[in-house]
Regions:
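N-terminal pre-domain/capping segments
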Residues: 1-103, 320-323
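Short amphipathic alpha-helical segments and helix-helix/interface helices
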Residues: 20-28, 43-46, 105, 148-152, ...
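Acidic-and-aromatic substrate-binding clefts and catalytic sites of carbohydrate-active enzymes
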Residues: 12-19, 31-47, 61-66, 95, ...
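Histidine-acidic metal/acid-base catalytic patches
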Residues: 2-8, 25, 87, 98-104, ...
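A generic structural signal for alpha->beta connector loops
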Residues: 31-32, 51, 158, 190, ...
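A cross-domain feature marking catalytic cores of carbohydrate-active enzymes
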Residues: 6-12, 37-40, 56-63, 118-120, ...
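Active-site acidic/histidine proton-transfer and metal-coordination neighborhood
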Residues: 90-192
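Aromatic- and acidic-residue-enriched segments that line the glycan-binding/catalytic groove
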Residues: 65-76, 134-138, 249-256
Length: 323
C-alpha cells in the first residue's frame, strides 16, 4: 500500500521548497511514499518530479452540470453575467471545458501517475446551505459519464481512473445501484473508486463521533458487497459535522447575486462541514484493513506544512497501532 500526502503543483505554493529533494524530504518525514498531486498552475522549477507522483487529482468544479448542459438561465441566476461564467470555468464552451480535463489526464500520463481522481459531484452555493437539490444523483452521474467517456474514448492512458465520492448530488457511495450504474457506464476499462472517508461521513448527519463514522463506513461497505472490490484508493480523513449541518440548514442565507462575495462567505461554511481532520480513533484501522487499498492518501487540512506533517504522522500512528 502506498501512503501518500496531497500536494498542489503551482509556483507560489511550491516556493517553500528550494529543490525537489526538499519536497521529497518533507513527505518522507511524514511517513509517506509519495504524492497525490493536483495541478493548479505551472511548476517552472520542476519541483514535482515523476518519481514522487503516485496519483493525480484532476481539475474539478463544484458547480458545473448546468454549464455542461448549457442551461443559460441557471448560469445567469447563479453567476450573474457571462463574464463571471468565463472567470469561473476559464472558458465559455464545452470543447474548451473538455480540454482542461484532457490536459490534466495528459499531465498524469506524463508524470507516470498510477491513478487519476475525478469528482462525481455537483453543488451550487445555495444548495450547500439548503441541502435542497437542483439535480438528481443520476443526472450528475450521467453528466460525469459523458465527460469522462469523451475524454478517454480512444485515449491510450495507463493510469487507473478512480471515481471519488462526495456527499452532494452525484456519487456518494450510499446507493449500490447507482455505484454499479456509474461503473458500468464509464467506458474506460482501468477504473475504480477512490473512497473518501470524510466525505462518506458527511453523507450521514446523524454521525456524532469517529467511531460512529467508522461503523457507517462499514455499513456502506456491507451494502455494496462485491462492488467494494472496486475501491482501489482511499482519501483518509474524518469529519464529524452533522450537528452543525442540521442547525445550519434551518436558517440558510438568501441568494446573493454577487457571486464572488457569496463564494467567499460560503467557503468557511463548507470547511466547517468538510473538516479533513485526522483520525485519532483506532476504529479506523479496521476500515483500512478491510478495504486494503493500493493507495492511501492522507488528505488533511492544516494551517501550514508543520501542522500537516504533525497530523499525517498522527494518522499514520493510528494506522500502525501505536495509538
Amino acid at each position: 500500500m502506498y501512503r501518500l500526502i496531497n500536494a498542489v503543483s503551482e509556483n507560489s505554493i511550491l516556493s517553500q521548497y528550494e529543490t525537489s529533494a526538499d519536497l521529497e524530504a518533507y513527505f518522507r518525514s511524514c511517513g509517506c511514499d509519495g504524492l497525490e498531486v493536483i495541478r493548479c498552475g505551472e511548476d517552472d522549477r520542476k519541483i514535482v518530479t515523476p518519481e514522487m507522483v503516485v496519483g493525480c487529482h484532476l481539475v474539478f468544479y463544484s458547480d458545473w452540470v448546468d454549464f455542461w448542459l448549457g442551461r443559460q438561465d441557471r448560469l445567469q441566476y447563479k453567476f450573474g453575467s457571462p463574464e463571471v461564467v468565463q472567470q469561473m470555468y476559464m472558458c465559455d464552451n464545452r470543447d474548451d471545458f473538455i480540454a482542461q480535463f484532457k490536459a490534466d489526464m495528459d499531465y498524469a500520463q506524463r508524470m507516470g501517475a498510477k491513478y487519476a481522481v475525478f469528482h462525481v459531484s455537483d453543488v451550487s452555493i445555495d444548495e450547500g446551505y439548503t441541502y435542497q437539490w437542483e439535480h438528481t444523483d443520476k443526472e450528475v452521474i450521467d453528466a460525469s459519464i459523458e465527460l469522462l467517456n469523451i475524454c478517454t474514448d480512444g485515449a491510450d492512458y495507463s493510469f487507473e481512473l478512480l471515481l471519488e465520492n462526495l456527499w452532494w448530488k452525484g456519487f456518494s457511495f450510499t446507493d449500490p445501484d447507482l455505484t454499479k450504474y456509474m461503473l458500468d457506464k464509464v467506458h474506460y476499462e482501468n477504473k475504480g473508486i477512490m473512497l473518501d472517508t470524510g466525505h462518506l461521513m458527511n453523507a450521514n448527519t446523524a454521525i456524532r463521533s469517529q467511531a460512529e463514522g467508522c461503523d457507517y463506513i462499514h455499513r456502506c461497505l456491507d451494502e455494496h458487497g462485491e462492488l467494494s472490490k472496486y475501491i482501489r484508493g482511499m482519501h483518509l480523513h474524518q469529519s464529524v459535522s452533522g450537528a452543525y449541518v442540521e442547525e445550519a440548514i434551518k436558517n440558510p442565507p438568501p441568494h446573493d447575486y454577487d457571486y464572488f462575495r457569496s463564494f467567499a462567505e460560503a467557503y468557511d461554511h463548507i470547511l466547517t462541514i468538510d473538516t479533513h481532520k485526522p483520525f485519532t480513533d483506532p476504529a479506523v484501522r479496521g476500515v483500512v484493513e478491510r478495504i486494503a487499498p493500493e493507495y492511501l492518501c492522507h488528505e488533511l487540512s492544516a494551517k501550514d506544512n508543520a501542522e500537516k506533517a504533525e497530523f499525517t504522522r498522527l494518522q499514520n500512528a493510528v494506522l500502525d497501532g501505536k495509538i
